[in-house]
């Protein structure tokens, strides 16, 4: 984010009360910003065709601020208006900041992120942007110099989509790191790369069967090459020592503090297992959450889901909400795990994996919906999206009242044109990530071909069909 634009994204508190909140005038505001270019974003939404709302502060010369001063009291917006109007909210203890024309925006809300991973990755080897196996290994070496023998070296960020036709192997990684198990997670988490010591620690050898919905890449002799795809990744990641509760809380706080510095006021945690959820609850009870958390329980953690079916949705806290569940229906386009209606263009005979074969529990998902929880289902391929729509429509048909829970399809990345019109009638939100379009640009058409790619990243087409969209960065 451009720091001169942020002052900082409305103080990381959110635009929760725009105008006229004049309570507590006697003591005055806690904080006042003056002489800013304030964009309240309180005008109407764009039309389905993208036309700007009639009441938006926009003309032929561009966008214009609709206020210049903001008053804050007890973590809430007290007043928004002109610098002169704001004077009534001055008190003896008010801090006033002249922002000298800087842009002030409402706090940001990210609707799909992985907070603990965002924090954890700050202490792992960062491989984002590496172009070759050798570059990746050099970066691991530079970042892990001095690591004691036997200790795990963990990194992340190599692009499984970009590297899918030339995956590395354990050979060079093992030569460089003979005395440490090394596990390197891909950019989106749908592939992992390990050295031989890591494979041995995890008990992965030529006899290891592939789990449903996963692949262990093997050489001509049947030995694992060091690359595990989709659900097979857990065979290796499970061998890495779990963080302590204190470390996990630290990862979560690091992730949230990183977001707070960039102007976020709330985040949707896309999948929280028991340990993560309990950490959120401890942090909330101690008043330590710096950003509001909308926790989506992990459907893969059945015990946690059963616990919350008994408890019911939790919405009473100002800092932690738990009324949603995250599920995976298929895998990723980059790893060719997303479920397609027809063969992958660059792998004839292969259509990806979905549903029960990818660990989707239809019965538990329906129970969670019927217990009052919103569900957000990860679906990327056109078949994955179609089958997810089939499932959601069937549950809603038997329980029409649950449509009000605003169920979601996470990513909705490749949607067949025949299915675009099915979202809105069922009230299903398309929770999409514009960065994926940019990240996948170099290989997406290779995967699905020139015709199917027209249904990929189809934000405007979905919006024209009346579908509610929510955008996010899929931070991790």
Predicted regions and their residues:
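Phosphate/diphosphate-binding loops
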Residues: 291-323, 406-412, 417, 443-469
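Divalent metal-binding segments
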Residues: 21-34, 42-308, 323, 327-384, ...
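Short acidic/histidine-rich active-site segments
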Residues: 333-336, 373-383, 432-434, 462-476
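Bacterial N-terminal signal peptides that target proteins for export
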Residues: 1-8
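Bacterial N-terminal signal peptides
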Residues: 8-17
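Histidine/acidic-residue-rich catalytic or RNA/ligand-binding cores of hydrolases
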Residues: 196, 277, 281, 385-393, ...
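Flexible glycine/proline-rich, aromatic-decorated loop/lid segments
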Residues: 341-345, 425-462
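Non-cysteine beta-strand/loop elements that form the S-adenosyl-L-methionine
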Residues: 319-337, 427-438
């Amino acid at each position: 984010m451009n720091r001169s634009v942020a002052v900082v994204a409305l103080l990381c508190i959110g635009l929760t009360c725009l105008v006229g909140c004049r309570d507590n005038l006697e003591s005055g505001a806690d904080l006042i910003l003056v002489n800013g270019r304030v964009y309240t974003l309180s005008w109407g939404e764009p039309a389905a065709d993208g036309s700007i709302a009639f009441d938006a502060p926009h003309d032929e010369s561009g966008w214009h601020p609709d206020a210049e001063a903001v008053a804050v009291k007890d973590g809430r917006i007290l007043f928004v208006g002109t610098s002169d109007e704001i004077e009534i909210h001055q008190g003896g203890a008010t801090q006033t900041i002249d922002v000298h024309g800087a842009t002030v925006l409402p706090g940001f809300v990210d609707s799909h992120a992985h907070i603990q991973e965002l924090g954890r990755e700050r202490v792992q080897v960062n491989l984002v942007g590496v172009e070759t196996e050798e570059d990746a290994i050099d970066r691991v070496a530079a970042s892990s110099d001095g690591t004691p023998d036997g200790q795990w070296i963990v990194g992340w960020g190599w692009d499984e989509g970009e590297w899918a036709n030339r995956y590395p192997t354990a050979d060079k990684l093992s030569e460089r790191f003979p005395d440490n198990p090394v596990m390197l997670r891909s950019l989106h988490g749908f592939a992992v790369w390990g050295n031989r010591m890591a494979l041995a620690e995890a008990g992965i050898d030529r006899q290891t069967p592939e789990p449903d919905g996963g692949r262990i890449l093997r050489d001509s002799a049947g030995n694992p090459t060091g690359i595990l795809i989709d659900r097979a990744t857990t065979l290796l990641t499970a061998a890495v020592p779990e963080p302590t509760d204190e470390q996990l809380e630290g990862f979560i706080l690091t992730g949230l503090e990183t977001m707070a510095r960039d102007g976020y006021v709330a985040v949707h945690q896309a999948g929280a297992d028991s340990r993560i959820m309990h950490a959120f609850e401890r942090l909330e009870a101690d008043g330590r959450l710096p950003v509001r958390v909308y926790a989506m329980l992990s459907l893969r953690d059945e015990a946690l889901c059963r616990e919350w079916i008994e408890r019911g949705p939790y919405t009473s806290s100002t800092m932690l909400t738990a009324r949603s569940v995250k599920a995976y229906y298929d895998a990723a386009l980059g790893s060719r795990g997303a479920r397609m209606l027809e063969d992958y263009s660059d792998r004839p005979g292969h259509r990806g994996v979905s549903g029960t074969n990818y660990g989707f529990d239809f019965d538990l998902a329906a129970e969670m919906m019927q217990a009052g929880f919103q569900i957000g289902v990860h679906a990327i391929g056109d078949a994955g999206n179609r089958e997810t729509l089939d499932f959601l429509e069937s549950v809603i048909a038997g329980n029409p009242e649950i449509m009000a829970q605003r169920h979601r399809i996470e990513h909705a990345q490749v949607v067949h044109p025949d299915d675009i019109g099915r979202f809105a009638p069922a009230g299903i939100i398309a929770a999409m990530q514009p960065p994926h379009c940019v990240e996948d640009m170099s290989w997406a058409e290779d995967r699905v071909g020139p015709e199917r790619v027209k249904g990929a990243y189809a934000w405007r087409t979905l919006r024209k069909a009346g579908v509610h969209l929510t955008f996010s960065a899929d931070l991790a």
